[in-house]
Regions:
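Conserved ABC transporter NBD signature motif
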Residues: 78-90
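Conserved ABC ATPase signature
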Residues: 147-151, 155
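Short helical segment in ABC ATPase nucleotide-binding domains corresponding to the A-loop/adjacent helical element
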Residues: 110-118, 128, 239
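The feature captures the beta-strand-to-loop junction immediately N-terminal to the Walker
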Residues: 55-57
Length: 268
């Protein structure tokens, strides 16, 4: 068990924010080498305790949009705010999990997770305790000294989730996190991801998911933005008003899938 004083010392596992939300205002983006606008005038916000999804056809810049939200690349136009303060540079308060399973093969599971704590300047012994706690949270107790090549794709993705959460972010960005997993593993993680990221032992307050899988989106989301067109803009916003856990046997589930699919067909 990690001592409470360690979590508080580095602001790990606790947060003093009353409301944590990410807001973007009229975001647009063009690649520096091209005048083509990828997406234009995207505005929305996430609220506390909410998982928001973004869906759209291939080529509408969804992954690029997450990189802009995380300040890895600057927007061509528009502004980003976290809890009311403008964000212009990368911050550990916003974590991004890429669609490729990004683990460093020469590091153990524990060392992969500890890597994220360098941004918090945590002492080595305390970083180990905090990282072990996060590995426990994602179900990898006993695999601390295993290397990625010794682990399944699902286990490596759990390492990526633990590494994203260990630095105490308040916003988690998920870019197709299950796309490279087999269906059984993906379904297992989908069932766990909502309760995992909003676990009381993490600081996370909201999450944004990009996905092409509409079943996945309806299963996980509180709210969905549909983007379409050239350049991409928001064409629909859908609130998923279903109790959890959600079942595909519920006719309402497929009503939401059909509604999202209709939005994707706009401008074809």
């Amino acid at each position: 068990m990690v001592e409470e004083s360690i979590w508080n010392k580095y602001n790990i596992g606790t947060t003093t924010l009353v409301e944590s939300e990410l807001e973007c205002q009229e975001l647009s983006y063009s690649y520096p080498s091209s005048s083509k606008v990828i997406f234009k005038d995207i505005s929305f916000r996430t609220c506390r305790g909410e998982l928001v999804s973004i869906v759209g056809p291939s080529g509408t810049g969804k992954s690029t949009f997450l990189r802009v939200l995380s300040s890895l690349i600057p927007p061509s136009h528009g502004r980003i705010f976290l809890n009311g303060s403008e964000v212009n540079t990368p911050t550990p308060d916003i974590a991004l999990i890429h669609q490729s399973i990004a683990t460093l093969p020469w590091m153990t599971a524990l060392d992969n997770v500890k890597l994220a704590l360098k941004c918090r300047k945590v002492d080595a012994d305390e970083a180990t305790q905090i990282s072990l706690k996060m590995l426990e949270l994602v179900g990898l107790t006993g695999f601390e000294n295993a290397y990625p090549k010794e682990m399944s794709g699902g286990m490596r993705q759990r390492i990526a989730i633990a590494r994203a959460l260990v630095a105490s972010p308040v916003i988690l960005l998920l870019d197709e996190p299950f796309v490279h997993l087999d269906e059984l593993t993906a379904n297992s993680l989908r069932r766990e991801i909502y309760s995992l990221v909003f676990n009381p032992e993490t600081t996370l307050k909201s999450a944004i998911l990009v996905s092409h899988n509409l079943d996945e989106v309806v299963q996980l989301s509180d709210r969905v933005y549909v983007v379409n067109g050239t350049p991409a803009t928001i064409v629909d916003e859908v609130n998923i008003e279903m109790d959890r856990p959600r079942s595909q046997k519920d006719p309402l589930f497929w009503n939401y899938v059909d509604k999202l699919y209709s939005g994707l067909k706009i401008a074809e």
